[in-house]
């Protein structure tokens, strides 16, 4: 009511500089002169449109959000959360496809990470997924990202071919040719291998020599060959920030067979699949390629006394996708490179993409970082020297014999917490009966609102005719034609209706979101980050706007006859 007069007074001043038809300019002037009077008609229009928007959206919004919220939480039809700290073993995963009516599944590792290297930085949720499998069975809404889930998750991988560095079965020792720039006590050279049995082991090559470039040799008798080389490490006992900085030269890796013959596996100067391991000081290891090998400038930081390089395709960090809250709260951008802290390990990361929302996020934290499951577990296993398994599985289930399928899944995973769409829907307040009830309430409220609006519009029109009778007579006496008079009325009413529709739609959407948010928050589990959608009742909205327009046209017809009548009456009175 306070803003409306100001708007039309400004509009009246603006049109003073523009040459407009008399009916248009006078209509705007009339509203600016009597803005508080016309505000009542405007309030009727705003109330009708906003009220219709709000009440017609309740049952529709409840229904669609109830269904989508369950899908957001389960990702697919069924989601299993393993309670065992050892995760879901490979043999347990193989059992899944033996369960009848299970079409497909995908594994997930959910964990916690923090910014920086102290472990006390800003916390966020880590979701390690299978980029190729998850999009085939997961639910994903169009407004969750600028692209489809499949396109978004492709940013976790790059089309590169990494050649594994393999030690075959006919070797018993391994050698690294290296040299330290100076004498460093209690500093050992290690090589990390993944054996044919899947175990990750460290082979020590002894104290690092500083006198000259020499071979550092380790025994492979306890390694299941063939084995893959994962990393070259330097170990120095001590706390994480007290390691001795020095420069290490690495020339080549050789395998030694049972006849003590050496076979060169790689020359460090020609092999480009190496990157520094982050430490407690971040990315403080600098790697420089020279003509015969590589030089490592090792800083004071370490991971439990370990520094060095690891074999990888991703020299700038493990690709990650983050949500918009992560970017905002941590002041990061796409392609930023930094170190995070996960399970006691410092992990190098590069942000390759972003997503607005992702199913099942916000279970533990508001911020989210998504990894390729294989890539992040490879690095964590390398540093922890133990197998990292997924702790969740999402399953796509055929609807035939659904209940029996759930029982079969539960019997195979007795310790896992199971979330399925059917059970969550049954727990929800958004039942079919509740939807029907709200639909009935909305229908009754709509027709009551419609009746009140039409009565209010009719009442205002009658009162307005009497209130403006003298002004209309003056216009007639001044020679204003019937067409011009109708133009004045048309401008008045159409301006009021246009502004009212705009304000009514905006206020209706706002009020509808608040109302539906209150209803959804009463449900069995409120996910504050789940983006509710407002489903507009277009039929009711179009219907009430159409009836207002019909009433407007009818009002113009009545006013036309009324103006003709009062002019005739005034003419006869003047003649008498």
How should each PLM-predicted stretch be described?
Residues 5-155:
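Juxtamembrane segments of multi-pass membrane proteins
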Residues 31-32, 476-483, 575-576:
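Short helix-to-coil transition segments within interhelical loops
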Residues 35-62, 434-473, 483-484, 493-511, ...:
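Hydrophobic alpha-helical transmembrane segments of multi-pass inner-membrane transport and secretion
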Residues 68-69, 98, 103-104, 108-223, ...:
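Short beta-strand boundary microenvironments
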Residues 73-74, 224-233, 300-321, 355-399, ...:
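Small-residue transmembrane helix packing/gating motifs
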Residues 77-83, 177, 321, 327, ...:
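A short beta-strand structural signal in non-transmembrane regions
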Residues 350, 408-452, 464-467, 488:
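Peri-transmembrane interface segments
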Residues 502-546, 556-570:
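Short helix-loop junctions at transmembrane helix boundaries
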